[in-house]
């Protein structure tokens, strides 16, 4: 005699097991939901933030920053969208001001290419300077890090001219062309190291030389590291201003041309913001302004008295805008050093900065003021430069 497959007791047991599964699943979901990070909830769009008083409202002039592919203008503590994100995989990034501050050159990055555009201060597109998109993905091109000469007549940028034998070796070189185009008149300045990323972030100097960041393969560590380089003219071999061990990049020259700010990592996972005296050809031993932060994109104030940069709050999180006072150039400069030198040449790093809504009390003469966190709930693009004009 066969027994029935389903009995009341067996059905009740299965129902109880199902209830336990559902309850445990919901419980785990709620537990992890209560303990998950709130970073995504904290980030707000700059235009949604009410104008602030405090240090950010006292920044002189106008700043341009990028968040989420949208270009924002910051004036007196108020953020205004200038170029809204095109949407999809496209984004605006890396603004560079005209010398008179009445317009910009910006990068539009798309899925497989990027181009340079001229826009006015209200965000109206005036001219597309490059046309790098191709029907064939392998022949797309990239243009990044635009920077205009002091008189605004020449545009410098990084560009990847494809190797016809090896289209997948995407490596950037420094180029220049007339500010209004056409690209057919572009001139190649540097020869990058293959398979490294190349030469980026050119800064034209009044002397006609160009400072840039070069990525190279370090045989000692078997890693790709960066150095600050200087080249006197197009096609000339560049000369290193920093050692490869220091892994320095993102150079920014002060308005007076006598100081250079940079981001250095020493090949580690954290960075320091450093400043060095610059005579147009060489750097003096640097001084650490901010240490143990993931600092990025240092940018000088129009009067050279301070530097803004991007860094997350603490060891992780979204990138906020910070400001730190910059020491004035000394009246008597030490002998120049051909490279940034060993770590012993640096000033003693300050403690890791503590976020603050207002500046800390005036420190002793042997210490510099702590950096001030100007924003707290935004999420700026750390790979995009900052533009600042009086």
Could you describe each region identified by the protein language model?
Residues 3-390:
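Sequence signature of WD/YWTD-type beta-propeller architectures
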């Amino acid at each position: 005699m066969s027994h029935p497959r389903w009995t009341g007791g067996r059905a009740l047991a299965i129902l109880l097991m199902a209830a336990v599964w559902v309850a445990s699943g919901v419980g785990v979901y709620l537990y992890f939901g209560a303990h998950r990070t709130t970073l995504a909830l904290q980030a707000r769009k700059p235009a949604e933030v009410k104008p602030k008083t405090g240090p950010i409202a006292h920044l002189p002039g106008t700043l341009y920053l990028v968040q989420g592919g949208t270009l924002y203008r910051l004036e007196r503590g108020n953020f205004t969208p200038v170029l809204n994100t095109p949407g999809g995989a496209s984004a605006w990034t890396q603004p560079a001001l005209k010398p008179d501050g009445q317009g910009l050159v910006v990068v539009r990055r798309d899925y497989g290419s990027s181009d340079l555009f001229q826009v006015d201060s209200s965000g109206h597109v005036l001219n597309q300077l490059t046309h790098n998109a191709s029907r064939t993905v392998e022949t797309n091109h990239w243009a990044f890090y635009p920077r205009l000469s002091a008189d605004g007549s020449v545009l410098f940028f990084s560009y990847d001219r494809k190797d016809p034998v090896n289209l997948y070796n995407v490596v950037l070189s420094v180029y220049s062309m007339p500010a209004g185009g056409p690209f057919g008149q572009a001139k190649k300045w540097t020869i990058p190291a293959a398979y490294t990323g190349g030469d980026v972030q050119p800064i034209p100097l009044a002397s006609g030389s160009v400072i840039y960041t070069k990525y190279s393969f370090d045989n000692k560590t078997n890693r790709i590291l960066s150095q600050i380089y200087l080249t006197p003219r197009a096609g000339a071999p560049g000369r290193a201003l920093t050692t490869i061990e220091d892994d320095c990049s993102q150079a920014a020259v002060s308005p007076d041309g006598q100081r250079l700010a940079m981001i250095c990592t020493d090949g580690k996972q954290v960075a320091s913001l450093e400043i060095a005296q610059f005579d147009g050809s060489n750097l003096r031993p640097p001084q650490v302004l901010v240490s143990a932060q993931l600092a990025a994109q240092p940018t000088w104030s129009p009067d050279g008295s301070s530097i803004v940069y991007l860094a997350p709050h603490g060891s992780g999180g979204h990138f906020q805008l910070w400001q730190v006072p910059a020491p004035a150039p000394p009246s008597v400069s030490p002998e120049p050093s051909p490279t940034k030198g060993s770590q012993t040449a640096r000033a003693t790093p300050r403690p890791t900065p503590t976020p603050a809504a207002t500046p800390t009390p005036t420190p002793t003469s042997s210490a510099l003021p702590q950096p001030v966190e100007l924003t707290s709930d935004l999420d700026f693009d750390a790979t995009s430069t900052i533009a600042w004009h009086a």
